Swiss-Prot record:
One of its GO terms (molecular function) is oxygen carrier activity. The keyword Metal-binding applies. Belongs to the hemerythrin family. It comes from the Bacteria. Transmembrane segments: none annotated. It comes from Stenotrophomonas maltophilia (strain R551-3). The keyword Metal-binding applies. PROSITE patterns: HEMERYTHRINS. This is Bacteriohemerythrin. The lineage of its organism: Bacteria, Pseudomonadati, Pseudomonadota, Gammaproteobacteria, Lysobacterales.
């Protein structure tokens, strides 16, 4: 499998989320490099990094959806929970000595691309509107308003 390449249709228009998604894709490419160089310890480190980073990304994304009052937030959270359980199973298989790198990378890339293009695009407009409203309300707030605009505007 070749290295993954960011595609413009993966942008949801919330800069911080788009940057986090790009970082996950970079990690998947690191997984590929570690696997092709036959470095099992490096593969394990990348798997741990992907899992940890993805969980923090999900928590951040879910907080944004909740704050924006996104009506399908609970369903979106359940999708995240199922994904985390699935990846945890791969992690256990790896720890048991199984070579799951290709299978995991394929599953992760397909899932991520489909999730961004579907589930994440679905909440983007509502979250952007909420963030823009918040920034407008706090625009005179100096640093906070500028920071919010930089990250979310």
């Amino acid at each position: 499998m070749a290295l993954l390449v960011w595609q413009d249709d993966l942008n949801i228009g919330i800069d911080v989320i788009d940057q986090q998604h790009r970082r996950i894709i970079e990690m998947l490419n690191h997984l590929h490099v570690a696997q092709t160089s036959m470095q099992r310890a490096a593969v394990g480190e990348v798997i741990d990094e992907v899992v940890d980073y993805t969980m923090s990304h999900f928590a951040f994304e879910e907080e944004l959806m909740e704050e924006a009052g996104y009506p399908f937030c609970a369903a979106h959270k359940r999708v995240h929970e199922v994904f985390i359980k699935r990846v945890a199973e791969y992690r256990l298989r790896f720890q048991a000595g199984e070579d799951i790198s290709d299978e995991l990378r394929t599953m992760l890339s397909r899932w991520l691309f489909n999730h961004i293009r579907g589930d994440d695009q679905a909440y983007a407009d509502q979250v952007k509107a909420h963030l823009n409203q918040f920034a407008r309300e706090h625009q005179s707030g100096g640093w906070l308003g500028r920071t919010l605009k930089r990250f979310f505007g």
